């Protein structure tokens, strides 16, 4: 079991089998949970319901199971809908109104918008780079230099860019639904996959592991 984050870094989970009680964490099943945001999914749902009066968009959790399955191609949507700190929307209005909507979320609601491949996540400010840094910090606090820290990041959307720039090794995964991610021009150790996820993840890690002489425990 390894630590992980969800909802674009809004919430972190650390397995109790590896980590002792972590500051500011809550007990959640077999994990210590840390929330990096200050509004939960229910609060965001209520905010978005009010904003629907002025803008044209759909809140994903309001759609039928059939429509969500068609949009996502997922076999099981339970985990996708089990959100703690955010809501997903599909924008159906024009660009001008989207700019106005974005201002209201950011300024009036103190929130952020993370554009994924097909959906937009609405939450309190968070991103995967912040989550990655926090996980690294907690590793260091818990184990000091026991574990070798060389961060590898894989991503295929704009909301992965900050995390990819932060990592020592960045794997940009091909994505037909999104424009190519542009990383910092001085960024080193960047690998671009030829395949899309999930095979692009495997392709990237296999080639990176070869470059690192088998240091990745696959």
Each predicted region: which residue ranges?
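Short, well-ordered alpha-helix to beta-strand connector turns
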Residues: 1, 85, 167-168
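Active-site phosphate-binding/coordination module
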Residues: 1-61, 175
């Amino acid at each position: 079991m390894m630590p992980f984050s969800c909802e674009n870094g809004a919430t972190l989970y650390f397995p109790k089998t590896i980590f002792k009680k972590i500051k500011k964490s809550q007990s959640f099943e077999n994990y210590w949970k840390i929330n990096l945001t200050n509004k939960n999914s229910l609060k965001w749902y209520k905010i978005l319901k009010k904003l629907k009066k002025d803008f044209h968009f759909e809140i994903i959790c309001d759609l039928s199971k059939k429509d969500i399955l068609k949009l996502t191609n997922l076999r099981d949507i339970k985990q996708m809908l089990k959100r703690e700190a955010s809501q997903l929307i599909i924008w159906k209005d024009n660009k001008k109104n989207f700019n106005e909507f974005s201002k209201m979320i950011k300024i009036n609601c103190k929130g952020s918008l993370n554009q994924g491949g097909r959906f937009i996540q609405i939450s309190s400010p968070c991103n995967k780079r912040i989550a990655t840094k926090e996980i690294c910090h907690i590793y260091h606090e818990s184990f000091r230099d026991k574990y070798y820290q060389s961060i590898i990041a894989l991503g295929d959307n704009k909301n992965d860019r900050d995390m990819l720039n932060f990592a020592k090794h960045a794997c940009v995964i091909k994505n037909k639904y999104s424009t190519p991610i542009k990383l910092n021009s001085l960024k080193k150790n960047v690998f671009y996959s030829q395949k899309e996820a999930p095979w692009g993840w495997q392709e990237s890690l296999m080639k990176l592991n070869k470059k690192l002489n088998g240091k990745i425990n696959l």
